[in-house]
UniProtKB/Swiss-Prot annotation:
Keywords: Disulfide bond, Neurotoxin, Postsynaptic neurotoxin, Secreted, Toxin. Postsynaptic neurotoxin. One of its GO terms (molecular function) is toxin activity. The keyword Disulfide bond applies. It is found in: Secreted. The keyword Secreted applies. SUPFAM superfamilies: omega toxin-like. Expressed by the venom gland. Belongs to the neurotoxin 12 (Hwtx-2) family. 02 (Hwtx-2) subfamily. This is U4-theraphotoxin-Hhn1v.
Length: 37
Protein backbone atom coordinates (compact mmCIF):
# COMPACT_ATOMS: atom_id res chain seq x y z
CA UNK A 1 0.00 0.00 0.00
CA UNK A 2 1.17 3.51 -0.71
CA UNK A 3 0.89 5.91 2.19
CA UNK A 4 -2.17 8.11 2.08
CA UNK A 5 0.19 10.78 3.38
CA UNK A 6 3.71 10.15 2.14
CA UNK A 7 6.54 9.96 4.65
CA UNK A 8 8.89 12.88 5.05
CA UNK A 9 12.38 11.44 5.00
CA UNK A 10 14.45 14.33 6.30
CA UNK A 11 17.38 13.30 8.42
CA UNK A 12 18.96 15.84 10.74
CA UNK A 13 22.17 14.61 12.29
CA UNK A 14 21.37 11.36 14.08
CA UNK A 15 17.64 11.98 14.44
CA UNK A 16 15.24 9.45 12.99
CA UNK A 17 13.32 10.37 9.86
CA UNK A 18 9.99 12.09 10.42
CA UNK A 19 7.06 9.73 9.99
CA UNK A 20 3.46 10.61 9.26
CA UNK A 21 0.78 8.18 10.33
CA UNK A 22 -1.17 6.07 7.88
CA UNK A 23 -4.84 5.32 8.48
CA UNK A 24 -6.44 2.26 10.03
CA UNK A 25 -3.67 0.75 12.13
CA UNK A 26 -0.96 1.09 9.49
CA UNK A 27 2.32 2.97 9.75
CA UNK A 28 4.63 4.59 7.24
CA UNK A 29 7.90 2.82 6.46
CA UNK A 30 10.07 3.45 3.41
CA UNK A 31 7.18 5.34 1.77
CA UNK A 32 4.89 2.32 2.16
CA UNK A 33 2.14 1.60 4.67
CA UNK A 34 2.97 -1.43 6.79
CA UNK A 35 0.80 -3.07 9.42
CA UNK A 36 1.49 -1.50 12.80
CA UNK A 37 2.12 -4.39 15.16
Amino acid sequence: FECSVSCEIEKEGNKDCKKKKCKGGWKCKFNMCVKDI
